[in-house]
Amino acid sequence: KMAEMKFYKIQEYVEALRKRGMFASCELYGKEENVIRNLTYNSKEVSEDTLFICKGAAFKPVYLREAVGKGAVCYISEKVFELEAEVPYILVKDIREAMSVLANLFYNNPWEDLRLVGVGGTKGKSTSVYYMKAIVDDYLEAQNKKDSAVISSIDIYDGKSKVESHITTPEAVELQ
């Protein structure tokens, strides 16, 4: 399932949001059939055929203009932005909730192929996670399988490479 990426049309993102009760409205300017090949909320990561997510209290319209200049073909937001060109947009009730639906569709529901464990609490989460990882990895090694992955406030290990964590709760787009 993870081998080949399937891409979806703008209209399919609208339908996914509508199904989950997150859709508010949209103006697609006849571009509903355009295929989305990139999904991001970071204007520095925009490329051709990007669905750009306008999120956060610090979001500035200049980020959206930069994204459109780099190839964003549609944006999703809680409000409409004034732009020079007719850029399709999708309005949602809650951008953070909508991000999980967008990421799920864009990455073809990768969670369906995973077994997940979540740890919450006030103290000892990372310690508990690394104890669990050691136990699970011993089991996986005995089965001739790959190491387990981990996302913590210390680092993120996807089974291949490890990077230092910079935030305690990654966004849905990164988690997928």
Language-model features: locations:
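Short intrinsically disordered, low-complexity coil segments enriched in acidic
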Residues: 1-2, 176
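Phosphate-binding loop of NTP-binding sites
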Residues: 98-176
